[in-house]
Swiss-Prot record:
The keyword Ribonucleoprotein appears for this protein: yes
GO MF terms held by the record: rRNA binding; structural constituent of ribosome; tRNA binding
Protein name, UniProt field: Large ribosomal subunit protein uL16
Alphabetized UniProt keyword annotations: Ribonucleoprotein, Ribosomal protein, RNA-binding, rRNA-binding, tRNA-binding
Gene Ontology cellular-component terms listed: cytosolic large ribosomal subunit
Biological processes per GO annotation: translation
Subunit relationships: Part of the 50S ribosomal subunit.
Short name of one Pfam family: Ribosomal_L16
InterPro entries on file: Ribosomal_uL16, Ribosomal_uL16_bact-type, Ribosomal_uL16_CS, Ribosomal_uL16_dom, Ribosomal_uL16_sf
Keyword rRNA-binding appears in the UniProt entry: yes
Species for this entry: Hahella chejuensis (strain KCTC 2396)
Its biological purpose: Binds 23S rRNA and is also seen to make contacts with the A and possibly P site tRNAs.
Similarity comment text for this entry: Belongs to the universal ribosomal protein uL16 family.
Length: 137
């Protein structure tokens, strides 16, 4: 599963997820992309589940790029522990997703197959997504 090798701080504040994606919002590597239209958090497990689904669907052909990385630690206190006594240990890692963010990219497959694979992957993700193709400038 994806997570940072090392971080400056072990735990972070909750923060707020606002605004639109200013970076990582175009198809940069492949021909087709899965773009977020909603806002939310995607865990490392969800990123991996969607990747495995796409890989199974396209079989040997094509290449997949993961354009997001879970770099925010989410903490959780153990069950039946009283309030206070500090922040709990890190439970899992998430990527904060803003509308417009490119989640995955793919090339080397037909548009029909890419669309199918992204539809299957989107079912594993907690944010609304859309299929996009590369626009040549």
């Amino acid at each position: 599963m994806l997570q940072p090798k090392r971080t400056k701080f072990r735990k972070v504040h909750k923060g707020r997820n606002t605004g639109l994606a200013q970076r990582g919002n175009k198809v940069s590597f492949g021909e087709f992309g899965l773009k977020a239209t909603g806002r939310g958090r995607i865990t490392a497990r969800q990123i991996e589940a969607a990747r495995r689904t796409m890989t199974r669907r396209i079989k040997r052909g094509g290449k997949i790029w993961i354009r997001i990385f879970p770099d925010k630690p989410i903490t959780k206190k153990p069950l039946e522990v009283r309030m206070g006594k500090g922040k709990g240990p890190v439970e899992y890692w998430v990527a904060e997703i803003e509308p417009g963010r490119m989640l995955y990219e793919m090339e080397g497959v037909s548009e029909e197959l890419a669309r199918e694979a992204f539809t299957l992957a989107a079912a594993k993700l907690p944010v609304a997504t859309t299929f996009v193709t590369r626009t040549v400038m």
